[in-house]
Design a protein with these regions (language model features):
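Flexible "cap/lid" loop of the alpha/beta hydrolase fold
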Residues: 71-77, 140-160
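Short beta-strand immediately N-terminal to the catalytic nucleophile in serine-hydrolase-like folds
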Residues: 111-113, 138, 164
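C-terminal catalytic histidine-bearing segment of alpha/beta-hydrolase fold enzymes
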Residues: 162, 178-218
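Serine-hydrolase catalytic machinery in alpha/beta-hydrolase-like enzymes
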Residues: 4-106
Length: 218
């Protein structure tokens, strides 16, 4: 095992693809799976939307090393989740660079995730603000023991940002969802926040409708 293997544990993991090749697509969606899940499982979102969204999309779903983007709960001290967290953020950056090289800019790319993947989606966009096609966080929030505003500086340039979560989720404190939405509002994103009564840790049809609308607006 090399030092790079230790510092970048997600390097070399597969990226599953659906839809058009990036070189042939007009827009893209990056899908980030949750803890214990897989790239294949998060691609079920593509299957759910396939017949009702535009067909000129590239869908990319990276696989986390050992099915986990970072080892501890997302509201643990950030250093406990290193180096896995930095490695996971780097994977998102590398996918965006790959899409850009294929002719798909960030403003034509949606970053979407569920659970750990939702947290990662928000954390990447918050640390790297700019105009994206959209950011969709299903059951997630910004990462860290507290929300450190100093990490999130710049402008989201009215990027659509959707946060959806249950009013009681055993993994996601509702307060963190509200705090995360406030950060993105401060950064100038077009924020939609939905708290669903009794939803639990899952995805509902209303969230899929928001996802569909975000994609269609690309």
């Amino acid at each position: 095992m090399t030092l790079e293997d230790i510092n970048h544990p997600h390097k070399g993991q597969p990226v599953l693809e659906k839809g058009r090749r990036p070189e042939d697509a007009a827009a893209a969606v990056i899908l980030l799976h949750g803890r214990g899940a897989s790239a294949e499982s998060i691609l079920s979102l593509e299957r759910s939307l396939r017949d009702t969204v535009r067909s000129d999309l590239a869908w990319l779903a990276p696989q986390a090393n050992y099915h986990t983007w970072y080892p501890y709960h997302f509201i643990q001290p950030e250093e406990k989740n290193e180096p896995s967290l930095t490695s996971a953020l780097k994977i998102v950056e590398e996918l965006l660079e790959r899409l850009s090289a294929a002719g798909i800019p960030r403003e034509k790319t949606v970053i979407a995730g569920f659970s750990q993947g939702a947290c990662l989606s928000l954390e990447y966009a918050g640390r790297n603000p700019g105009r994206y096609g959209g950011v969709l966080a299903l059951s997630g929030g910004l990462i860290g023991e507290t929300v450190d505003d100093a990490k999130y500086q710049g402008s989201m340039e009215e990027t659509p940002v959707f946060l959806g979560c249950s009013d009681f989720d055993p993994h996601i404190p509702e307060d963190r969802v509200h705090e995360s939405a406030e950060v993105f509002e401060r950064l100038g994103a077009d924020v939609t926040k939905k708290i669903y009564e009794g939803l639990g840790h899952t995805i509902n049809k209303d969230e899929l409708n928001y996802f569909r609308a975000m994609i269609e607006a690309l």
